[in-house]
């Protein structure tokens, strides 16, 4: 298991030039230098909590009254997180978007046309269909209620993808998303535009907005209304969404003196999809846990893994032929006072020179039809494909 706290006095190639960027409706946070790197996954929380506390404490003598931790946290075992304590920040909060000139400047850039040399889907469609069938058998036997199976698409491009240009397109095409870009070492970079907030904590107030079940948007207004109406009325989709909400209620209730959860979900849209979402707000008990400790208790929700969680994890390990790495982890920031904001790592990709890895997941419940439940995989991959200047047909 990779666990590491590295000081920047002896930087390694795998952690040089962080150039981290995270944006949300709360503002923009960026950093270009680091004091510490932590790679421990969330499944080792006692060790991770100790390492974070030590790294934040070490940043105070350098002049940071309220140091920040930024980056991406891997939730599942078998791989590394990528968490940084910046060496210096202009403040201890995200800068409001209106004050962040990088946003407007990047959005005006254009991605140059590129050409796909090869495409590899992992797993192939036939193997994915077999995994869905195995999941349906597990549901029928009462062993599982839901599982989320994912697909990786590996593209080889004629020209290397420019991370700055791709990020500009992501921000322009998905202005209300949670945008993120961070280095993974050896020239690799994770970036994306997630529609889903896992958790935000600010001065004792907690907020989460889980998304579960989706449908592809239509180009015609009449059909668009029908798609949205059918999603909101679907018993199967409502059932799957309720699994997520019930689990979040179970986790948050002991930590909150107030917790407001709507009785039914509402519709939320991105540029390609309609989602069922439920905004949940509350107030933490006095002296309660930090945003990151709560996030690690919440994640992975049934929307990212399945239910029951441990059985779904085991099923995924048995069926998926690749490691998800940081895909389906969480990305964001927290400060030394327990405040912060973390989004789910979806609608994302890893850029590595001429090669790009894209990821998409599908929630499977009883009644799902192989090979995919809900939108086609190309629809969820469409966020990154559009930012890369590629056609959606690449993913079909």
Curated annotation (Swiss-Prot):
Span-the-membrane segments of this chain are none
| Pathway connected to this protein | Siderophore biosynthesis; amonabactin biosynthesis
Q: Name one Pfam family in it.
A: Chorismate_bind
What are the protein's GO molecular function terms? isochorismate synthase activity
Q: What is its EC number?
A: 5.4.4.2
The reply to whether Protein biosynthesis figures as a keyword in the UniProt entry is no
Reactions catalysed: chorismate = isochorismate
> Top EC class per UniProt?
isomerase
Question: Hey, what's the signal peptide range on this chain?
Answer: none
- Matching PANTHER family, A to Z? ISOCHORISMATE SYNTHASE ENTC
Q: What does this protein do?
A: Involved in the synthesis of amonabactin, a phenolate siderophore containing 2,3-dihydroxybenzoic acid (2,3-DHB).
Q: Which NCBIfam families match?
A: isochor_syn (TIGR00543)
Could you say which protein family the record assigns here? Belongs to the isochorismate synthase family.
Q: What protein am I looking at?
A: Putative isochorismate synthase
Organism equals Aeromonas hydrophila
């Amino acid at each position: 298991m990779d666990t590491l706290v590295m000081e920047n006095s002896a930087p390694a190639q795998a952690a040089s030039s962080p150039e981290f960027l995270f944006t949300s409706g709360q503002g923009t946070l960026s950093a270009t230098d680091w004091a510490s790197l932590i790679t421990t996954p969330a499944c080792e929380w006692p060790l991770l909590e100790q390492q974070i506390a030590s790294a934040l404490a070490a940043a105070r003598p350098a002049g940071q009254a309220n140091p920040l931790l930024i980056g991406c946290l891997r939730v599942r075992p078998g791989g590394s997180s990528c968490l940084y304590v910046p060496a210096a920040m202009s403040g201890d909060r995200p800068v409001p978007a209106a004050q962040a000139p990088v946003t407007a400047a990047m959005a005006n850039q254009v991605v140059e046309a590129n050409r796909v040399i090869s495409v590899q889907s992992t797993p192939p469609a036939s193997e994915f269909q077999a995994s869905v069938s195995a999941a349906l058998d597990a549901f029928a036997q009462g062993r599982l209620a839901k599982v989320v199976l994912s697909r990786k698409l590996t593209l080889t491009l004629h020209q290397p993808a420019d991370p700055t240009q791709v990020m500009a397109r992501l921000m322009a095409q998905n202005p209300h998303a949670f945008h993120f870009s961070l280095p993974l070492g050896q020239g690799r970079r994770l970036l994306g535009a997630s529609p889903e907030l896992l958790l935000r904590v600010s001065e004792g107030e907690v907020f989460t907005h889980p998304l579960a079940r989706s449908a592809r948007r239509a180009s015609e207004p009449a059909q668009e209304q029908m798609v949205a109406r059918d999603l909101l009325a679907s018993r199967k989709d409502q059932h799957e969404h309720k699994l997520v909400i019930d689990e979040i209620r179970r986790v948050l209730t002991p930590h909150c003196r107030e917790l407001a959860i709507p009785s039914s979900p509402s519709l939320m849209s991105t540029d390609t999809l309609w989602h069922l979402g439920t905004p949940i707000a509350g107030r933490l008990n006095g002296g309660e846990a930090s945003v990151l400790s709560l996030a690690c208790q919440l994640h992975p929700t049934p929307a990212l893994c399945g239910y029951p969680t441990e059985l779904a994890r085991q099923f995924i390990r048995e069926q998926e032929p690749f490691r998800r790495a940081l895909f389906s982890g969480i990305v964001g920031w927290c400060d030394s006072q327990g405040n912060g904001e973390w989004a789910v790592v979806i609608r994302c990709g890893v850029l590595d020179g001429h090669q790009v890895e894209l990821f998409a997941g599908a929630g499977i419940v009883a009644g799902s039809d192989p090979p995919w439940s809900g939108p086609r995989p190309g629809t969820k991959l469409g966020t990154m494909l559009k930012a890369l200047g590629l056609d959606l047909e690449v993913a079909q």
